[in-house]
Design a protein with these regions (language model features):
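A short glycine-threonine-serine/GTX helix/turn-capping micro-motif
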Residues: 63-72, 120
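A short, glycine/Asx- and small/polar-enriched loop/turn
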Residues: 20-23, 68-69, 128-129
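Thr-Gly-centered strand-to-loop micro-motif
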Residues: 29-30, 69, 133
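NAD(P)-dependent Rossmann-like dehydrogenase/reductase catalytic/cofactor-binding core
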Residues: 97-163
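Hydrophobic packing residues within well-ordered alpha-helices of enzyme cores
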Residues: 1-4, 133
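Active-site capping/gating segments
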Residues: 11-27
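Internal alpha-helical scaffold of NAD(P)-dependent oxidoreductase catalytic cores
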Residues: 3-9, 25-63, 74-112, 156
Length: 163
């Protein structure tokens, strides 16, 4: 706003890199001085690269930490799965396509059915292999680790916005 002046409608947006393949998440907002219709225009434009969510300005740093940085978290998880597959002696040439399809298929299933907890429970047999792996996630604090990563990115976004 300071750079543009009061006579210019301003839309703040936070896209992410999956927009490059039409599967992005973009958050948008405007301030009280801008014409609210400008959000309709921005949303229409940005739906070309994925889903658009209108959020309040106060939530933008959290959006940055979750969906702006989120693709890197998913890619880091993919790297970890590939490395774990290599440690389990799977052939190197199948690891990346296998993990890519795993993530793509799981995302498609989640998009089709929703309810990530229910989907996780459906694939987890009590005392089975999946339960053993998920127990490690629980014991080593996966949820806290992810929450801390999002919080750190949110804090850094706030710091960058203040400078």
């Amino acid at each position: 706003r300071a750079a543009c002046g009061d006579g210019v409608d301003v839309v703040r947006s936070m896209p992410n890199t999956p927009a490059m393949v039409g599967k992005g998440v973009t958050a948008i907002c405007t301030d009280a001085k801008s014409d609210p219709a400008v959000l309709d225009w921005a949303e229409e434009l940005l739906t070309a690269v994925g889903m658009v969510f209108r959020v309040d300005e106060e939530h933008f740093d959290a959006v940055t930490g979750l969906t702006g940085s989120g693709p890197a978290y998913v890619f880091a998880f993919a790297e970890a799965l590939i490395a774990a597959g290599a440690e389990a002696d799977l052939p190197a040439e199948v690891l990346e396509p296998m993990v890519t399809q795993l993530l793509s298929g799981s995302s498609a299933l989640l998009a089709a059915q929703g309810n990530p907890a229910g989907l996780r429970e459906a694939v987890t047999s009590p005392g089975g292999t999946t339960a053993a792996g998920l127990n490690v996630f629980s014991e080593q604090g996966l949820r806290a680790l992810v929450a801390n990563a999002v919080a750190a990115a949110k804090t850094r976004s706030r710091e960058l916005g203040a400078s």
